[in-house]
């Protein structure tokens, strides 16, 4: 049913990074002179989506969220992570108050808050699926939801995988595909890769979409060629989703993330080579040389 709309509407692929400001990007992707409150506006000329990782650590102030909305186009996408007290500390139980506060805080984003991202801890396994199902049933309408699991059973045990898919499908929620296969193909060769090896989960590539809005998080290596070679299966998968009329959001990471904005645009170009109907990304704001004043 997805493919019937492909030729009738504009085709847009949303791509982005794990953050919108990062010191190594100053002067390379973002102008040196920008204040912190203007960096999202510049980032949004490179990418049309961003992971909302900061919301995991604290619910943002209303004025902060209003600033995010003012700096981005109406079709820019934030995939916002639910706060840690909801997912990790209370494990989805008795979370009405923090959830209500979070939803009120992000209201100024409107449709820019494209999906709310429920990242669950590695200890959240098949035995906890009833808690997840109950939580998803209680969530308000008007938002899209995507769930990231890290417990190995969901990837190694077909029965557990199918049970999780049923829970998500009943709620209309997506399964976030977090692909770390390239990161763990070979031993790390840089400090950033060694740190990523310690912190990131070993998860397989999972390319099955449950909804019309798939979410992919891909992490490569610090060597650009390794990262590009590793994402080739995703180019085909994402192109296929677009042809089916789905609307994916793809995030490109590397352990050091130094070249992430450029890699994001390269991935977008690779998909456009397969699906020429995809709209081009915005023209990036010139970063300019460093200045003394």
Question: Which functions belong to the PLM regions below?
Answer:
Residues 3-293:
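Residues lining hydrophobic/aromatic ligand-binding pockets adjacent to catalytic sites
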